[in-house]
Amino acid sequence: MVCEMETDQIEEMDVEVLSSMWPEDVGTEADKQFNVEKPAGDLDTLKEVTIETRTIADMTRLPNLLNSTHQGSSQLTNLVKQWEYMQDNAVRLLKEELKNLDRQREEAEAKELKIIEEYKFESNEPENVPVLDETSDLFRRFRQKKRDALVDSKKIEIYEEFDTVAYWKQKALSLEKMLEASTERERRLMEKLSESLKTMESQSAPVQELTQNLKRAEGFLHFILQNAPIVMGHQDKDLRYLFIYNKYPSLREQDILGKTDVEIFHGGGVKESEDFKREVLEKGKASKREITFTTDLFGSKTFLIYVEPVYNKAGEKIGINYMGMEVTDQVVKREKMAKLREDNAVRKAMESELNKTIHITEETMRAKQMLATMSHEIRSPLSGVVGMAEILSTTKLDKEQRQLLNVMISSGDLVLQLINDILDLSKVESGVMRLEATKFRPREVVKHVLQTAAASLKKSLTLEGNIADDVPIEVVGDVLRIRQILTNLISNAIKFTHEGNVGIKLQVISEPSFVRDNALNADTEEHEQNGLTETSVWICCDVWDTGIGIPENALPCLFKKYMQASADHARKYGGTGLGLAICKQLVELMGGQLTVTSRVSEGSTFTFILPYKVGRSDDYSDDQDEFSDMADQQSEPDDTAEGYFQFKPLLGSIYSNGGPGISNDFLPHKVMLTSPIKLINGFVADPSNNTGQSEMLQLENGGYMDESKLETSSGHCPESAHQYENGNGRCFSKESESCSSSQASSEGGTLEMESELTVSSHREEEKAETEVKETSKPKILLVEDNKINIMVAKSMMKQLGHTMDIANNGVEAITAINSSSYDLVLMDVCMPVLDGLKATRLIRSYEETGNWNAAIEAGVDISTSENEQVCMRPTNRLPIIAMTANTLAESSEECYANGMDSFISKPVTLQKLRECLQQYLH
Amino acid sequence: MDTLIAQLQRQFRDYTISLYHQGFLDDQFTELKKLQDECSPDFVAEVVTLFFEDCEKLISNMARALDQTGNVDFKLVGSSVHQLKGSSSSVGAKRVKGLCITLKECCDTQNYEGCVRCLQQVDIEYKTLKAKLQDLFNLEQQIVQAGGRIPQVDI
């Protein structure tokens, strides 16, 4: 039944052959020969098959059991009844026969009696009649009468032949004959009787047949049971086996009978089954249970066990009947199904979860994209505003106007910074941030950053730069990004520090453990390969301050976007909360780590460690040599090995217009003069502080030194005072005047003072620019198809003091480049005839190959006569700046991929143009 | 006389501000104005004139292209609108620029109805702007003629 149900359930699955419950290859040889699991032939041949009984039973106790159990006894009673019934039937038949015979005999005897009577009458014997008795008299009379009547009827016959002998003879003969016949009949009856008796004997045959039938039925039963995958058994009250069917083959009779499960088997499930049986025995209710056995004997098998209590005639429990069916496969399948269903559910749940996540991610991406686009859209006009303000600041303004303008510029810068932050962040997050590997000097960078910070410093803070001696002069890395990080951290430090020091400390450290762990192998290989030319160095950079510090509980969320240590801080100090997030992301992008340690009201230290590639150490020593005899060197060597810079607060710091020299983000037009003893571009510093601080770093006007752009114009090496002579004396008195005025004034005063300064420095700048122009006027080519854009750009260029040539499309650009040499190309991306990207590719191809073959192939008409001219030209890389309406990551990627150096987003503003020219025109 | 100049100046300032506030112009126009100096006193007017000529030409181009019912060269329209977008962005014609962006989108999706509708709007918008700027330049001229200085307008 169970088996059937199971097969129904697994119908869709492959119906497999049910294997034998017990393994085939166990059991003793002796057991085996009786083990006729599957007799050959079909059921019809059952009679011929000798079915050995596999039953092991205690023969002495079985009858007892049978007698004492209900089933046994009732079965036996049935048999007996049936047998009795058959016997009765036979007996009844025989009795009837006997009755018949008896009757026949009685008849015969009656006849005989009659004959004898008749004979008596013939002999005429006197009858003894009691005389005295009246009744007898009466009886006699009656008899008389009767006899009379009888005699009377025969009297005549007798009378007739009475006299003759012949008659008597005849009479005797006939009597004799009758006797004979009678005897004969008797004999025949006797014969019949004996025959009857014989048949009686043969009546025992049905019993035998019955026995045979019984045997056959039993055989059939055995056959069925033998093939059935079940174990059956009977156990007594103590759960000792009295009987078992289909036992495990290797167990012998004596191993099982009289023993309990626990005694026979060992392992899991045995105890359970034993308990279950006992429970059934106690409760007296048949029940089923699935039990998994794990025994040494047959491993792990699951059995469906049915146990029922057995009662004797008196209604007392005497044991249990036990039936077990192996359902291991079914259980396994069922479990598999359950597992599958569970897996399915889990997968579905995960899928929906995933969908949700995807949805959220998409939403986030869209939001980010939106933010980036929006930021960009805001940035373009804003930079216009700021740029215009800057241009405005170069014109003649009264004090009030200038003050307003400065506020406008600084707030504009702030917003620009914020938008740049957002764009940077989305760039890093979307993975399109490209890192560049350029050689740079860490000392210069630190100095420059501090210098810039000092320029916008409005507090009495000392800025310090400290670079360990073992830091290489030159390393390779993405200097722009590193500068960005430093600037960010420094401006943070300054923001949260009211007095004391802020500084940067650089030192070489051994490879940090977080890298060593996961990149040990790769790195060593690299070292081996590049050992001669290039090695990696890890530089640890601390940006420390003596500021308000950060409470410990705020540290974890410090690097999260839009998070600041507390809302109070955000209100008090402003800021977007993006700076640190960007720093962290950038540092991680470059394979480093940014950490922070801080104590409240003692200060914070932000530390980032980054790997850099280093050139050969030869370079270093070369630089050293160069440095050693620097007497009449340019200003550069000063930076190369200088390990310590300090920017002390000069009471009433002087702001000056530094001109276009600084390419940094923050208020690039301002530079603070802080070096105590130096004259910079003729500005005099506090002469009282004139102790020889040769270690001190001096601030030059607007970082010209770094850019080394206008060396020729002023050539101000701070070490040699004679260079200040360069016609700056005229400012002397004015500057000292403003110094003193600013000393006495607050911030507002500083603004006022600036106007004068600006005028002078502006004049100076113009002068410098004319000088530059005279020496080498840069040639700029604008490739743009939109007349209005051309007009605007041209006008801006004019403002910046440049003129430029115009090409209306890529082909014209190529022709122009072919015929004349340019220092910079501003290239629109989207143009008719030949777009900016393709044109750039062709120009780059020309630079590489020295011919315009690629362009000619592309269908650009280049006159051959000019080719010769071309070949003479130096094949320096021509800076090509893209002008694009869309600065989103992909577009800029495309620009870079096509060989462009940078890009300006449209609409072009004065500020953008100026930055670009600063970067690419030397 | 001074009162007239002051009046004109105030009028000019208000009018300029209204143009910004109503979204006709954006900061790029301010940028243009900064580029105007002694060397090129009519710079803005020149650029703007060029722009309106450009507008006229491009719009008629697009109108012609969109007139070819059933056989509209959306690529042609697209390149024209790209040009117009660049120009309007450069002069700070904010509304025209915004419409150009929408028109470009319609064009990219080949939405004929949208294109036609947008183009009509662009036409209206640029003409309005032209009229307004004309007014503004007239005011400027009046100020100059009255001997006044064109005031700086902070937006």
Curated annotation (Swiss-Prot), chain A:
<feature type="compositionally biased region" description="Low complexity">
    <location>
        <begin position="738"/>
        <end position="747"/>
    </location>
</feature>
<feature type="domain" description="Histidine kinase">
    <location>
        <begin position="373"/>
        <end position="614"/>
    </location>
</feature>
<feature type="domain" description="Response regulatory">
    <location>
        <begin position="779"/>
        <end position="921"/>
    </location>
</feature>
<keyword id="KW-0936">Ethylene signaling pathway</keyword>
<dbReference type="Pfam" id="PF00512">
    <property type="entry name" value="HisKA"/>
</dbReference>
<dbReference type="InterPro" id="IPR036890">
    <property type="entry name" value="HATPase_C_sf"/>
</dbReference>
<dbReference type="InterPro" id="IPR005467">
    <property type="entry name" value="His_kinase_dom"/>
</dbReference>
<feature type="coiled-coil region">
    <location>
        <begin position="169"/>
        <end position="205"/>
    </location>
</feature>
<dbReference type="InterPro" id="IPR004358">
    <property type="entry name" value="Sig_transdc_His_kin-like_C"/>
</dbReference>
<dbReference type="InterPro" id="IPR001789">
    <property type="entry name" value="Sig_transdc_resp-reg_receiver"/>
</dbReference>
<comment type="function">
    <text>Functions as a histidine kinase and transmits the stress signal to a downstream MAPK cascade. This protein undergoes an ATP-dependent autophosphorylation at a conserved histidine residue in the kinase core, and a phosphoryl group is then transferred to a conserved aspartate residue in the receiver domain. Negative regulator of the ETR1-dependent abscisic acid (ABA) and ethylene signaling pathway that inhibits the root elongation. Promotes stomatal closure.</text>
</comment>
<keyword id="KW-0479">Metal-binding</keyword>
<keyword id="KW-0175">Coiled coil</keyword>
<dbReference type="GO" id="GO:0009736">
    <property type="term" value="P:cytokinin-activated signaling pathway"/>
</dbReference>
<dbReference type="Pfam" id="PF02518">
    <property type="entry name" value="HATPase_c"/>
</dbReference>
<feature type="modified residue" description="Phosphohistidine; by autocatalysis">
    <location>
        <position position="376"/>
    </location>
</feature>
<dbReference type="GO" id="GO:0009738">
    <property type="term" value="P:abscisic acid-activated signaling pathway"/>
</dbReference>
<dbReference type="GO" id="GO:0000325">
    <property type="term" value="C:plant-type vacuole"/>
</dbReference>
<dbReference type="InterPro" id="IPR011006">
    <property type="entry name" value="CheY-like_superfamily"/>
</dbReference>
<dbReference type="GO" id="GO:0004673">
    <property type="term" value="F:protein histidine kinase activity"/>
</dbReference>
<keyword id="KW-0963">Cytoplasm</keyword>
<protein>
    <recommendedName>
        <fullName>Histidine kinase 5</fullName>
        <ecNumber>2.7.13.3</ecNumber>
    </recommendedName>
</protein>
<feature type="compositionally biased region" description="Basic and acidic residues">
    <location>
        <begin position="761"/>
        <end position="773"/>
    </location>
</feature>
<feature type="binding site">
    <location>
        <position position="785"/>
    </location>
    <ligand>
        <name>Mg(2+)</name>
    </ligand>
</feature>
<dbReference type="GO" id="GO:0009788">
    <property type="term" value="P:negative regulation of abscisic acid-activated signaling pathway"/>
</dbReference>
<keyword id="KW-0611">Plant defense</keyword>
<comment type="subunit">
    <text>Interacts with AHP1, APH2, APH3, APH5 and APH6, but not with APH4.</text>
</comment>
<keyword id="KW-0418">Kinase</keyword>
<keyword id="KW-0938">Abscisic acid signaling pathway</keyword>
<dbReference type="Pfam" id="PF00072">
    <property type="entry name" value="Response_reg"/>
</dbReference>
<keyword id="KW-0460">Magnesium</keyword>
<dbReference type="GO" id="GO:0046872">
    <property type="term" value="F:metal ion binding"/>
</dbReference>
<keyword id="KW-0217">Developmental protein</keyword>
<dbReference type="GO" id="GO:0071219">
    <property type="term" value="P:cellular response to molecule of bacterial origin"/>
</dbReference>
<dbReference type="InterPro" id="IPR003661">
    <property type="entry name" value="HisK_dim/P_dom"/>
</dbReference>
<dbReference type="GO" id="GO:0005886">
    <property type="term" value="C:plasma membrane"/>
</dbReference>
<dbReference type="GO" id="GO:0009873">
    <property type="term" value="P:ethylene-activated signaling pathway"/>
</dbReference>
<dbReference type="GO" id="GO:0006952">
    <property type="term" value="P:defense response"/>
</dbReference>
<feature type="binding site">
    <location>
        <position position="828"/>
    </location>
    <ligand>
        <name>Mg(2+)</name>
    </ligand>
</feature>
<dbReference type="GO" id="GO:0000155">
    <property type="term" value="F:phosphorelay sensor kinase activity"/>
</dbReference>
<keyword id="KW-0472">Membrane</keyword>
<feature type="modified residue" description="4-aspartylphosphate">
    <location>
        <position position="828"/>
    </location>
</feature>
